[in-house]
Amino acid sequence: VSGTDGTGEGRPKSKARAYKDFDWGGMDRAGQAAAFDSIGDRYDEAFPHKEGQIASGAWLAEQLPAGAHVLDLGCGTGLPTARQLAEAGHRVTGIDLSGAMVKLAEENVPDGEFRRMDIYEVERYDLGPFDGVAAFFSLLMLPRAEIPYALRMLHQQLREGAPMAMSMVEADVDDFSLPFLGNTIRVSGYLRDELRQVVRDAGFEICGEDSYAYAPASTDVPPEIQIFLQCRRRP
């Protein structure tokens, strides 16, 4: 099920909670959505090897009860994570800001449910509760000031003790403008000690951590250090 205007579907079921004190300050993510609409399936061509994401997705799938409801936050094309979780027998709800990405995810993972939505709308439209969350390279698309709010929102949308697999690129940047596959996107990152603290402060226990040096296939994207955290929601 795809949204039609980037603002979710239906009427909000409840007022925002984790985001209620967030100062939007005229923030506009239309440029982010347009960039990924333009990139489309070239994203998977630029990042063909996703060993870290696949391994972390496998950990998540193994932690879930049978037929669990899982949120894929920033699902992109649905590959590999949404497909991996669906093939493991789980019910996948994927969201992405890009309508083109949502369309590709629907084609790649016909058993999943996908919506064109912003991250904060998961709470606004009460999509949970979820049995688990995958957040691979989605939180880095937010300014640093918003990331703790997004993590607290995920904490509220998860059942107690539920697993979360997430990844970020290690970098000390905030809302940094980056050329990316012929477009420009804005990204944020942390050095790993600060990232761990931000995640813990949002109410998560970190159960495991892996890092990978990654060189994308496209010369338009610089090499990066990818950090994968395996987490669990604390009460």
Annotate each PLM feature.
Residues 10-66, 172:
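Conserved class I S-adenosyl-L-methionine
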Residues 161-168:
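Conserved beta-strand signature within the Rossmann-like core of class I S-adenosyl-L-methionine
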Residues 124-133:
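A short acidic, Gly/Pro-enriched loop at the edge of an enzyme's catalytic core
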Residues 71, 77-122:
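Class I SAM-dependent methyltransferase SAM/SAH-binding core
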Residues 187-203:
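Short alpha-helix
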Residues 148-160:
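A short glycine-rich, Lys/Arg-flanked "PGG" loop and its adjoining helix->strand segment in the class I
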Residues 215-235:
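Core SAM-dependent methyltransferase catalytic element
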Residues 169-186:
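Short, glycine-/aromatic-enriched active-site segment of Class I SAM-dependent methyltransferases
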